[in-house]
Amino acid sequence: MILEGSGVMNLNPSNNLLHQQPTWTDSYSTCNVSSGFFGGQWHEIHPQYWTKYQVWEWLQHLLDTNQLDASCIPFQEFDVNGEHLCSMSLQEFTRAAGTAGQLLYSNLQHLKWNGQCSSDLFQSTHNVIVKTEQTDPSIMNTWKEENYLYDTNYGSTVDLLDSKTFCRAQISMTTTGHLPIAESPDTKKEQDHPTKPHTKKHNPRGTHLWEFIRDILLNPDKNPGLIKWEDRSEGIFRFLKSEAVAQLWGKKKNNSSMTYEKLSRAMRYYYKREILERVDGRRLVYKFGKNARGWRENEN
């Protein structure tokens, strides 16, 4: 690993490497490790000592950095602390998260054995950006086929998630044995002085659940009578045929067992990100949050 000012692990060569736990060197003493036991951020401490909340923060980080839909990772299957998480085998990850299990397992192994404190890991705006090599193509192909096939109602093109998405994060979905590489100084200079981003129009065939819901509202002629606006100006909408929406989403994601209960559970993960909100006291009624884009009438 190439990192500016990063530490390395001390491994006792007299023991079997597979049964060792990493020990943090003096270079990690500057991190506020103790705060991790009392609500610190997940990347500040070793995964072994994560709380249940920090485990969920880690899962949410993987969703955000890799631009995955919230339904890709079943959070309810990971209601465990870091000690339990680190003891889980690859088979247990696969049982809990399906095709995403191997990706989660690989990332956790990387953090366990190559972990850095946040001061070393997350300096994308001031220091070297760390990238990972491409995930095993066989894993990627399975992931793509099962999670990113578009329904024919949203176009005939099979739009698969580009494998580069998984390499976009600073420390992302890696398999053990892959070494991160550092960007060149020219790339670093561009990162320090980024160009002004261009506003993009929303994708009419959004891959995320909230975009899928938004697109039904914006194109009622394609799927009439499923969802309607309660107050367009405030972004409030109601499900009219909740199970039909769930089945359509399941068809889009190639998941025949999708129900509204599962769909609504996935929607909850957008609350923290302020993309969706639940309207209190009103069944099947939701509201777009401040971070949702593309639903307003005057929005380009």
Curated annotation (Swiss-Prot):
Extent of Basic and acidic residues compositional bias: 185-195
Highest taxon of source: Eukaryota
Domain PNT per the UniProt entry, residue ranges: 29-115
GO cellular component terms, semicolon-separated: nucleus
UniProtKB keywords: DNA-binding, Nucleus, Transcription, Transcription regulation
Subcellular location: Nucleus
Segments of the chain annotated as binding DNA: 207-289
Matching Pfam families: Ets (PF00178), SAM_PNT (PF02198)
Transmembrane helix as UniProt keyword: no
Spans annotated as Disordered: 179-204
Bridged cysteine pairs (disulfide): none
GO biological process, one term: cell differentiation
Predominant cellular place of this UniProt entry's protein: nucleus
Membership in a protein family: Belongs to the ETS family.
Function comment: Transcriptional activator that may play a role in regulating epithelial cell differentiation and proliferation. May act as a repressor for a specific subset of ETS/AP-1-responsive genes, and as a modulator of the nuclear response to mitogen-activated protein kinase signaling cascades. Binds to DNA sequences containing the consensus nucleotide core sequence GGAA. Involved in regulation of TNFRSF10B/DR5 expression through Ets-binding sequences on the TNFRSF10B/DR5 promoter.
Domain notes: The PNT domain acts as a transcriptional activator.
Record protein name field: ETS homologous factor
